[in-house]
Amino acid sequence: MLVQQEPDASSFPNGGIRNTFEARGYSAWDPTSPAFIVGGTLCIPTVFIAYTGEALDYKVPLLRSISAVNKAATEVCRYFDKEVNRVIQYLGWEQEYFLVDESLWAVRPDLMLTGRTLMGHESAKNQQLEDHYFGAIPTRVIAFMADLEYECLKLGIPVKTRHNEVAPNQFELAPVYEECNLANDHNQLLMTIMDKIARRHNFRVLLHEKPFKGINGSGKHNNWSLGTDTGVNLLSPGTVSYTHLTLPTIRL
C-alpha cells in the first residue's frame, strides 16, 4: 500500500488533456527522500503522476531532471575518471522571510488575505538603517529562531545559520547543503514549520517574494553544485593536474 496508491486526480487543472476514465492519478513512494513523523503522523514523500505518465506535481520534473543530469554528467566524468558511477546534484538554499507582530498583521486585510501589502505608504527609513543587516537579533526573534531550529533538527533539516537581512524585520535561515531532492523537500517542510512556530511566538511569517514596496524582497538563493560519488567537486578547479580540465569541461 505504501509503494503505490490510486487517488482521484480528476479535479486537477490539466486543461482536459485526459478522458474521464483516465482521470485517476498515481502516488508512489519516493525512496530517495526519508520519511518523517509530524504530530504522530508518518509522512512519506511521494510523487504524483497521471494515468498516462504526465507529472501532476513538481517533484516528478525535479527527479527527471536529476536523472538526466546524472546520466549526461557521468558520461563526461568517466573520460577523466573511470571509477565515477554517479554524479550527484547538491543544493544549499537560503530562506529569507519577514516577521510581523500578530496584532499588527490582524489589522491589515491585505496581509491576512494575500501575505503581502497591497496599499500603504513607505516608511521614513527603509533600507537606510545601518544597524540591521547582520546586526544584533532582537530577543523575541532569537526565541522564535531557536524554537524553529529545534523543530527543524528533530525532522532532520540541517539548519546552520541565522541572521538579520537587509530590510527591517527581515531575517534569513540557511542549512548545510544536501542532495538536491532532499534539500527541496526540507525547504518545503521548513516553510510549513515556520508558519506554525511563528504563531506560537505571536508572529506571522511572510514568505511572499515582495511583501513590501520600496525595500528588499525575500529571495531564495539556490547554491547548486555537482559532485561525483568518488568525492570530487566538479565545480572546483581541483589540485590534481587532470582535475583542472573537469571544471571547464562541465561548464561547457
Locations of the language-model features?
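Secondary-structure capping and boundary motifs in well-ordered enzyme cores
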Residues: 65, 140, 165-166, 182-186, ...
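Alpha-helix N-cap/helix-initiation motif
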Residues: 58, 62, 86, 137, ...
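Well-ordered mid-protein domain cores that form the structural environment of catalytic cofactors
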Residues: 173, 184, 189-192
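Conserved small/polar residues in nucleotide/adenosyl-binding loops
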Residues: 243-249
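Generic, well-ordered alpha-helical scaffold segments in large soluble proteins
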Residues: 72-80, 144-158, 190-201
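Core alpha/beta catalytic barrel or barrel-like domain that forms the active/cofactor pocket
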Residues: 39-49, 83-100, 112-135, 154-177, ...
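ATP/Mg2+-dependent ligation/transfer catalytic cores
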Residues: 1-146
